[in-house]
Amino acid sequence: MKRYGKIEIRRWCGVCFSFLIFAFLHCTLCLAQPKREFRGAWIQCVNGQYLGKTPQQLRSMLSEQLDVLHGAGINAILFQVRAEGDALYRSDLEPWSRYLTGTQGKAPDDGWDPLAWMVEECHKRSMECHAWINPYRAKTAGTKEVAVNHIAATHPERLFQYGDLLIFNPALEINRQYTCMVIEDILKRYDVDGLHMDDYFYPYPTAGQSIPDEANFRADPRGFTSIADWRRDNVNILIQEIHDLVRRVKPWVKFGISPFGIYRNSPNGKNSKEGSATRGTQNYDDLYADIVLWQEREWVDYLIPQIYWNIGYAVADYEVLVHWWNDYCGHRPLYIGQDVERTVKEADPKNPQVHQMISKYALQRSLPNVQGSCQWYAAAVVNNPGNYRTMLEQEYHKRPALQPLMPWIDKKAPKKVGKLKIQIVSPQASVVNGIYLAWKEPKAKKELDKATRYAVYRFAPGEKPTLTPDDASHLVAIVSEPRYLLQGNQSGYTFVVTALDRMQNESKPVKVKL
């Protein structure tokens, strides 16, 4: 038997102590439940999940997805409604999407409006619904024929070819006006909570291809001598115009963007304001998207960089990039775009026995400017690879979460609820029978002051029913109707209810002891 001296014993004790401290801190970071956190998921049309299904089958599939996502703590859906100058909603401006019915311009058989339906279904579940559009892509390789009212048929001169893509020419003011017209139509007709754009601006670089806009640059350089600066300004103008439009039409709608995960590559190989320690495609230089400028100018309300790579990936390390966005792009709420399937395929460098979800969430929740995440993609969460959804349900989203505050839009809390009481409900068509907490919706004259949701807290006998801005330990539900179904024996418990407005400013509490 090997004998260990005092030095070896001390060394092993030190290692064990360090491991226990690490494990404690690691678990604390993982299990901490923020009271406010964006927990989104993208529902895309471009993966073909809608094709070959009837509207009834689609509604059933999406309803099941929403139920599962809600159970996993997701509180916002980013729903793709414009993929290539088309519409997954009833529009007089653009044709129905081929991603919905298989043929561009063909309406759903029963006249279904997916966006109107999605808004209603999200709100039933107290989830936000953000309309997700692409402002520049007009046609992809998979679209063999366009509808007679598609922009490629009516105004092909406003598009340019890049590889197998047709792109709205960002240099043309008429295209910016048209995009804003499409957005205004959505805002005026649908009760969306957000307007969302993804990572497609100028096209991703393709070998052997060049952007055919030199004639536009020579004709109207607007004082720029660099075509790269001019291209960035073309996009800047649109982003500012969309911001101004949203604030004018529906000021409570959040305007957010999910850019590619790399802003710029650092010239010295270290994270700095100039860029991250990465070696990949760049927003600034390749897509002509100056993300940092947009948040500094306050043209966007949130950012979701798509950091789909893994910890330890040499070209674009997740850990390096999350730190960079936290350090240099935190002027607006910052959420991290997570790739579910990639996360569970790669082993954690610190613990090869598990995948990377634990370390990614520990890092995300340890940084002060990161206020949530968004899952790519919703169906992947539902499918639960590597128990990803199970971990959301049991660990990271164990408690509900309010949305991060946006005081530049509105910071006035709604009035508190009235007449909080116990109510016994008999069987009805629209309400499950049972014993409810019920209350009266507070009065409001302005849209921004109206209560749209309610937070319900529960305190055990002997606990002081006090709310704090950061404590979610007693938050049991966020509901859209002025009632909450009580489960089991709640005798002796104290319930607290607050009203939430569109920006989820929280009213003063009202409590009742059972």
Regions found by a protein language model. Give the residues of each.
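Active-site neighborhood of glycoside hydrolase catalytic domains
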Residues: I174-V182, K188-A277, T281-I307, G312-H331, ...
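Beta-strand-rich modules
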Residues: L485-S507
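Pro/Thr/Ser/Gly-rich low-complexity, intrinsically disordered linker/stalk tracts
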Residues: N387, M391-L448, Q504-L514
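Catalytic domains of carbohydrate-active enzymes, especially glycoside hydrolases
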Residues: S60-A87, R189-Y190, L293, W299
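Aromatic- and acidic-residue-enriched segments that line the glycan-binding/catalytic groove
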Residues: A87-G102, R137-G163, D199-R222, N268-R279
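Substrate-binding cleft of secreted/luminal carbohydrate-active enzymes
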Residues: Y288-A314, G330-I409
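Active-site-adjacent "subsite" loops/lids of carbohydrate-active enzymes
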Residues: R36, W42-Q44, G48-S60, A131, ...
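Solvent-exposed loop/turn segments flanking beta-strands in beta-repeat/beta-sandwich domains
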Residues: P442-D470, P509
